[in-house]
């Protein structure tokens, strides 16, 4: 989901 950005 939009939480994919947390992978940074």
Swiss-Prot record:
Q: Which GO terms describe its cellular component?
A: extracellular region
Residues that bear Phenylalanine amide:
8
Its localization reads: Secreted
Keywords on this record?
Amidation, Neuropeptide, Secreted
> A Gene Ontology biological process annotation?
neuropeptide signaling pathway
Return the similarity comment.
Answer: Belongs to the FARP (FMRFamide related peptide) family.
Q: What is this protein called?
A: FMRFamide-like neuropeptide FLP1
């Amino acid at each position: 989901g939009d939480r994919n950005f947390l992978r940074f």
